[in-house]
Design a protein with these regions (language model features):
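Generic hydrophobic transmembrane alpha-helix motif, especially the helices
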Residues: 121, 152-157, 162-230, 260
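Hydrophobic alpha-helical interface/terminus motif in multipass membrane transporters
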Residues: 160-164, 193, 220, 233, ...
């Protein structure tokens, strides 16, 4: 019965409309305003379906990241360790990491003092230097090298990768440059630079960065090739959008997750390279504390049961920083993927 009433009403309205159209505009002018305009009813479901989305990329990224409790816990711990490493020299009661402590009565050096004895929190080494001060100083040195290497590789690698993948005329040049650099082991270049130049923080940063960016560039290039000719990029080029704007607005946001992951992996890799180059005797001098120097010194006494703490503590710091950066980088990469933002 209800459907029949609706059909009859619809037919009646159609008949009236046909009559008005046949009579012309004069018939419409005679109608009162109430019959010409009818307010549309409000529907919450319809409004919700057509409303503006309040989506925020970075807001969704951080919400997804903070759901990973392990990554958040590691991030808090890593921030605490890094902050303490750089603030430690300014705390009260700290000593020079290169100071060789001696007994004020006998004048004998405090050699190989066990942790917790005579004011040495993590013990002392063979010449009486405080391992607590040296390990945190070494962490500062290694982290500084790693941060600068990651920053240089990211800036140079992203720039070269975008040009390599987006500008077709540069493809041959970057491909040949990649083939040349890729066929020379980065370890050999690092050893040569450390051997020719005097070992220093700047030398290590240069040696690690001089070829490290090429891997980032190739990775970015491959990602750019995937999205370069998608419809929205083709449309942007057709309407004359500047290349720089296309790169910044269309390409780089798509690559945030993979860039963050690569940078997070570069930091522990740089620390590992510093440890290796110091281990073979071409790294920083012993006057410059670094995790590589400390681990190398601890390796020499690791067979002596009472002195293994000299290898244990710097290894713990190195392992924690390496694992934390790796897991946090993976977690942030997953969180930055828009596919994981769906509720």
């Amino acid at each position: 019965m209800l459907f029949r009433m609706k059909d009859e009403k619809a037919h009646q309205l159609e008949a009236e409309l046909d009559k008005l159209q046949a009579e012309g505009p004069a018939a419409w002018a005679k109608l009162p305003e109430e019959e010409l305009f009818t307010p549309a009813g409000f529907s919450e479901e319809r409004a919700e379906a057509t409303s503006y989305s309040n989506y925020s990329y970075w807001g969704s990224t951080f919400r997804a990241f903070f759901k990973n409790r392990v990554a958040v816990l590691l991030l808090v711990a890593l921030i605490a360790v890094v902050a303490f490493a750089f603030l430690q020299p300014y705390l009260p009661g700290q000593v020079d990491p290169n100071l060789c402590a001696v007994d004020p009565v006998t004048g004998i050096q405090y050699r190989n003092i066990a942790p917790g004895e005579k004011g040495f929190i993590w013990g002392s080494n063979a010449i009486g230097q405080d391992l607590w001060a040296r390990i945190w100083a070494g962490a500062r040195t290694s982290l500084t090298i790693a941060f600068f290497v990651a920053l240089i590789e990211a800036v140079v690698g992203i720039t070269a990768g975008v040009l390599w993948g987006y500008v077709r005329q540069l493809d041959f040049f970057f491909t040949e440059l990649y083939n040349i650099c890729d066929n020379v082991p980065s370890t050999i270049i690092l050893i040569l630079i450390s051997y020719v130049a005097s070992p220093s923080v700047q030398t290590l940063i240069l040696g690690m960065s001089i070829t490290g960016w090429i891997a980032m560039a190739r990775f970015i290039r491959n990602q750019i090739l995937i999205i370069r000719d998608r419809d929205y990029n083709v449309a942007s080029r057709c309407i004359g959008t500047p290349t720089s704007r296309i790169v910044v607005r269309n390409l780089l946001p798509y690559l945030v997750s993979v860039i963050m992951l690569r940078m997070a992996l570069t930091i522990p890799a740089a620390i590992g390279s510093e440890v290796f180059i110091t281990y073979i005797g071409l790294g920083l001098s012993v006057e410059v504390p670094s995790l590589g120097n400390l681990i190398n010194d601890g390796r020499k006494v690791m067979m002596q049961a009472g002195l293994r703490y000299q290898l244990l503590y710097p290894t713990i710091i190195l392992s924690f920083v390496t694992i934390a950066f790796y897991l946090i980088g993976n977690a942030f990469s997953d969180a930055a993927d828009p596919k994981n933002h769906l509720q």
